[in-house]
Amino acid sequence: MRPVRRSAAVLFAVLGCASGRQRPPPAEPVDLAGAARSALQHAWSGYRRYAWGHDELRSLSKAPRDWYAEPLLITPVDALDTLILMGLHAEAEEARAHIVQNLSFDRDIEVKNFEIVIRVLGGLLSAYQLTGDPRLLALAEDLGRRLLPVFDSPTGMPYVNVNLRTGKTSGARSNPAEIGTLLLEFGTLAKLTGNDVYQAKAKNALTQLFSRRSPIGLVGEEIDVETGAWTSRQSHIGGGIDSYYEYLLKCWLLFGDEDCRGMWSSSIEAVNRYVADPTPSGLWYGAVDMDTGRRTGTEFGALEAFFPAVLVLAGDLDRARQLEESSFKMWTAAWAAADVFDYAAMRPTHPRWPLRPEIIESAWYLQTATHEPRWTAMGRRFMGDIEACCRTDAGYTVLDDVTSGKQGDLMPSYFLAETLKYLWLLGTPGALDLRTIVFNTEAHPLRRTW
């Protein structure tokens, strides 16, 4: 069986994916790494042709999209380490040159701290470690300095937004993910620059959040960073909370931080006790009240599918396997992993899939830990579906509806940073050693050199 070619992908997209469940399974590439590398070349070529100098590509309109009034080159920064790892040297050098010559953070724009940290700060730090280019570290340090005012709240937990030029902050209503998903990046910046304030501020934010957990050990999904009061007391592992748990564990793995290890151990015990939901259809993680553990929802989705990866890192392979199998049932119930999937009814309730990486990420971690062929086979299925349903003339695009195959009009930067990277890694066993690197939540590998 040969890798899906462009003509086949277009045929599936028109005649198959759009017709929903009647579509036969797509052609799956034998050479998964080669298919992922070719997909990255196609995606980069489309961005280069239609959105150069901008943040992202509208891949149906063949037009650029910027996040703010002025672009921050989010796709080139997010994609650079993927280009390097896949050996696309000309494209990587093109991206690096464009970044160091054109990226400036001296801009009068208000940005979302969390997204800029995981994508841009994380991307710059990873690319610096891979290339040794001091200009990338200088950009990272300039960005980190401009983001520091977010921590100037009464609690030390960060505001949501900050103006890169003035330092003015806004957005007191935040969530555990946006508060607790900063320490890998700010900690690495501190280690590489010798300025400990970055790590201290981010760790204080994390510990302040942890200290506000409920008596049964859970956090809610929204908190006021000025008062420290929870404004939503629903608990789960999905969007708004997800990477908080990820970073509790990974900050111990990257920095050897015993405080983080203790916070992780306490938290995962509570999550597995209250949030996990063993059902006849498999193991899932739903939603509960943070104070009582009472079940409030049976919704799982594409973002929650990151959790098997974290369980692998924690050594809980049995639970990781079970949850990844459940995630795969969610994928095959339609033609990708819906943003929201009701596992009690086994159907999508919010059927969008914006090219997310999490289910693929978890398959790679399981493959790395177990060497079982099951996970690589999953990767081939994921790659085949992406080619069939999401490929366009200009790159790849999100699915607005996984049940019908209706396409949207955006190629998010994380598709290049994460989704294609994890597909390539699934097809390239041993390419990265998890004993020496830790991925941030945007799949930027950070190497412990201290």
Residue ranges and their predicted role:
Residues 8-16:
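Bacterial N-terminal signal peptides
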Residues 1-8:
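Bacterial N-terminal signal peptides that target proteins for export
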Residues 1, 16-18:
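Coiled-coil-like amphipathic alpha-helices with heptad-repeat character
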Residues 18-450:
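Glycan-recognition and catalytic cores of secretory/periplasmic carbohydrate-active enzymes
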